[in-house]
Amino acid sequence: MYSLIKKSISTIALSTLAITSLPTYSVSSQTTEEYGARKYFINNNIENIKNIENKSFDLVQNLNTKILEKENIETLSGTVVDFTKEATVTSNSTIPNGLIIEKSNINITAGKGYDLSSEMGSEYVKALEKGTIIVSYKSTSNNSIQSLVSIGNNTSGNRDRHFHIYITNTGEVGMELRNTDSVLKYTLSRPAAVRSIYKNNLVFNTIAFKADPNNKQYKIFANGELLATLNTDVYKFINDITGVNNVMLGGTVRDGVIAYPFGGTIGNVKIYNEILTDEALKAETGATTYGKNIFYAGDSTKSNYFRIPSLLSLSSGTVVSAADARYGGTHDSKSNIDIAFSKSLDGGITWKNPTIPLQFNDYVAKNIDWPRDSIGKNVQIQGSASFIDPVLLEDKETKRLFIFADAMPAGIGSSNASTGSGYKDIAGKKYMKLRWHQDGSSTYNYSIRENGVIYNDVTNLPTEYKIDGDYNLYKNGIALLCKQYDYNFSGTTLLETVTNVDVNMNVFYKDSLFKVFPTTYLAMKYSDDEGETWSNLNIVSSFKPENSKFLVLGPGVGKQISKGQYKGRLIVPLYSSSYAELGFMYSDDHGQTWNYVAADNRNTGSTAEAQIVEMPDGSLKSYLRTGSGVIAEVTSINGGETWSDRVTVPNMHTTSYGTQLSVINYSGLIDGKEAIILSAPDSSSARINGKIWIGLINDTGASGINKYSIEWKYCYSVDSSNMGYSYSCLTELPNGDIGLLYEKYDSWSRNELHLKNILKYETFSINELKKPISN
């Protein structure tokens, strides 16, 4: 028999405070002046008697009961004791499984919030030791942090006792679980996770969070994707927060004041005493998705991370795309990076599984989650060769598709490349130079001659070694092999270890018998069947100046001149250091040979990534990233062989370090004029605030480089001004719409390293993009 004995007390309220192996209950006396306000903590694994003004009551094990206030209580048997006013004692063992609270269509004014504390089911929410929360929302606020759902202790002195799910105005999603920081503070977040605006309208996002005691794990989802996971040694949840008394939408009540105010609409919120599956949460949050992922974590590339978009519509109507498949997080080279490729046969609606046309196999290609903590996020793969920064280009006369990328030898990137071309001049011809692995680091006594035969340059005689079309090494006609490397983390230390897997030995690999000079190279392949098959690898950068540290591609697309004296010429943007920042290579024989031209005499080493458009007479304009906080324009009237001085593009803002941009010609007329379309972030503080500008081409009546001017008439915002926007690539789709493949995050921010599925593909009609520039 259970008993509770008390005489003439106004209210007794019981609530779960914490759960270890057994629940602990608080018994609150909120009474008349005679008894005062007192709180008693009774551990239910012992029968206790506490005195209240010399009166006593017992709380016994397994008391989970509703208590109703009544005068002159007498001893009752059983598990329910009646008082006259309802209060609740709850442990997780009595919380019903499944959905325990749901609300829909709640409009919230920022700073007001919406209190759920008295809603049916809220008493269960306050005692959860596991669960799932799903919330859809549309924010109208620009507050930096906005709580969507919070559960906590709102009384004075308890400001750090709460759990909340929040968003930021930069697109971050996160959660905090706190019971004063010295006792408990778990945080989990993912930047660049949600959006604010899509096609000129504020939009809903759907977020899910689950707390799983079985795996000691927390997960966050949004818009169809698993964003982040936190594994803990000691699992905690709502029931571990002292004195929970508040459930709130649209803010977190701290010391009686609403903090982190959200303004907008909560479309729906559901709280479960149940751990829903990842698949179910991806499906439910996928109700709000915007754009597509052509390349995504877990696809056929086996990469978790993608950067550097390239997008091109072919003359046949096929749309092709390329990107870096980055296996070592989102780091640049040096790293393990290949070039992924995909194509669409229906105008960009659906995309084929990606393939890898440019790939080194010295390091395994695998899905690995790169750490994002303050130490691990900076760790890079040290020994791998890599391809980086793709460029796509079609020769419309031959229908040949080219793909270019920078080729980096093992352990090399632009930052640590050696000055020099990587070639030597022998009898008036340039040959790639090689070092025998046992020779000194500066001794390059060998070269690759005709038919891939390796010569000893000291004797000028052929050796028994040669390379094939992909620079793999052979001896006496037999392919040489080396062991492939794997990479795994032990804490924040990256271990690069030799495996038992044999791969073809390549002169770009660190374990090759012959090694190329450790600088940057320009790689090219071509396809005559729209990317179904590819040619052998061609290294085309023998023209790299000897005083250049690096000569690399301006990623995006190349250009073929379609009219005028230089009709048919192929041209690809480059940039360098220590010689000229901006440069180009061009071909007049359909890509058989290439010539290099420097477009300036600057030597500050700024990243002058450029893209090219054609004027109505066949002259060219190139728009480029600079290191001076502006986007620049240069003009060529001789097919790209020489270029004008830089002119600043007005009213476009960029950071001091700049960002790659995309610019294309539009085939039709806009407002009766030929036009170009440009994509870039528009901010001087970060890679944020993506814009698409439409520029009308005006004939000034002048001649030479001043013949055409650009009237930047329209400007479309891809998302709100705080949302990340980095590298991008535009194309005109077969139906006349504009396709955009872009990095939807701030790729410069160290806080946004190693994010999955940030390469987004979206389409727009010209009418959607025609938003007049506001003065």
What do the predicted segments below correspond to?
Residues 80, 110-176, 273-280:
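Extracellular glycan-recognition modules
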Residues 75-128:
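Low-complexity, glycine/proline/serine-rich flexible segments
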Residues 203-219:
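Localized edge beta-strand/strand-to-loop motifs within extracellular or lumenal beta-rich domains
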Residues 176-206:
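Short, aromatic/His-centered strand-loop micro-motif at the edge of beta-sheets
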Residues 230-265:
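Flexible glycan-contacting loops in extracellular carbohydrate-active proteins
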Residues 45-56, 66-68, 265-291:
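Extended recognition patches within non-cytosolic domains
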Residues 61, 69-71, 81-83, 132-141, ...:
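Short hydrophobic/aromatic patches on beta-strands that form ligand-binding or substrate-lining surfaces
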Residues 274, 280-775:
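Asp-box/BNR beta-propeller blade signature and adjacent active/binding-site loops
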